[in-house]
Amino acid sequence: MATESPATRRVQVAEHPRLLKLKEMFNSKFGSIPKFYVRAPGRVNIIGEHIDYCGYSVLPMAVEQDVLIAVEPVKTYTLQLANTNPLYPDLSTSANNIQIDKTKPLWHNYFLCGLKGIQEHFGVSNLTGMNCLVDGNIPPSSGLSSSSALVCCAGLVTLTVLGRNLSKVELAEICAKSERYIGTEGGGMDQSISFLAEEGTAKLIEFSPLRATDVKLPSGAVFVIANSCVEMNKAATSHFNIRVMECRLAAKLLAKYKSLQWDKVLRLEEVQAKLGISLEEMLLVTEDALHPEPYNPEEICRCLGISLEELRTQILSPNTQDVLIFKLYQRAKHVYSEAARVLQFKKICEEAPENMVQLLGELMNQSHMSCRDMYECSCPELDQLVDICRKFGAQGSRLTGAGWGGCTVSIVPADKLPSFLANVHKAYYHRSDGSLAPEKQSLFATKPGGGALVLLEA
């Protein structure tokens, strides 16, 4: 599956209200009809938060919400980009001179990332122009990867316009790399699941090499997504990139402590691999090697035997140069314990004991506690929402996505779903002060959706 290209499917546009509406809007915008459509889904990460960029496996599933783009290649060399949502302004630019401004996370920059990634992969300097109309129903800045879905969708659009072929794995790797044009140092989970997802199954996504394994979720439970309605724009915040750097520094200090060649080490997983020990043993090494008090740059330099100048020029990224404290112990503890929870989650799904929903729920609860206390990527609203979800019948509930806002994911016994939805809606969304005006997408049950594909009108 992963070595195949994304599927191309013929559809009767008239039978799909959303496609039909997009086709009509495209016609009124550009005065022509689309040649093809591309869709790429968002995702919910069930467990395994902030560990993909440390080299560890994660366990997401695609959601049914997606980014859908109507496309018409044109003879000019101009990219005309529009969005069905009037909040997002149009863009007209040369298809062969793509400029991405890292300082402004504008919506169209995510499209340009995907386009530029494919363009550079093939070394294309004369890309034909295209008219594109984008429609997305993934709530933005909610931790469901609306931005990565747009990058992936744009990558597949560009590939299709070029008439070239790439496997799903290659596409995922190119799109993950290209998102860095906008300054997001993610680990590749979002792009991988967007391409590798299959209907009806979650996936264990492993890295180096990238591969996906089916994980059958319990039939007696439903996964429910609840949006805290606190928006977190990942590329606009330094939180995320500081955590990436804290993990990198923790890996280097652990490697140095164990007399490994620390200067070559970038990820916490590499330390474990080089030592050849279990995740549980890595947690013990972390206890011995690192202290819970925050590290300042001077102490890190002393531990590694380098100068401040070397730390700044050789290790720190441009956006972490001015950080004064780094919590290395807490971040490493989270990563190693969360990586172990992912493997336990998969094992429970495979063995399917009678109390599996309860066991999976406990792992999700532990994950949230670690995200909140050790990784510090929660926020008061997420913690409140998690408590409400547990109170009204979720066996487990946790933040999902980068955190600092966005969504929670809860595992709910199927027979409790109607009362769960009603009670959570009342407790969280019906504020007496009327401060939350949620869209209908704020609370919904979801099942594993399929991956990115090309749609042709039959």
Curated annotation (Swiss-Prot):
Site described as Transition state stabilizer, located at: R43
Report whether tRNA processing shows up as a keyword of the record: no
Catalysed reaction equations from the record? N-acetyl-alpha-D-galactosamine + ATP = N-acetyl-alpha-D-galactosamine 1-phosphate + ADP + H(+)
Q: Which Pfam families match?
A: GalKase_gal_bdg, GHMP_kinases_C, GHMP_kinases_N
Keyword set, alphabetical order = ATP-binding, Kinase, Nucleotide-binding, Transferase
Cellular component aspect of the GO annotation: cytosol
The disulfide bridges present are none
Q: Which GO terms describe its molecular function?
A: ATP binding; galactokinase activity; N-acetylgalactosamine kinase activity
UniProt: ATP binding residues: G143, S145, S146, N233, K234
Binding locations of alpha-D-galactose = R43, E49, H50, D52, D190
Does this entry carry the keyword Electron transport? Answer: no
Enzyme active site = D190
Q: Name one GO biological process term.
A: galactose metabolic process
UniProt-listed Enzyme Commission number(s): 2.7.1.157
> Which protein family is it in?
Belongs to the GHMP kinase family. GalK subfamily.
Q: Which NCBIfam families match?
A: gal_kin (TIGR00131)
Q: What does this protein do?
A: Acts on GalNAc. Also acts as a galactokinase when galactose is present at high concentrations.
The UniProt subunit note reads as follows: Monomer.
Quote the protein name from its UniProt record: N-acetylgalactosamine kinase
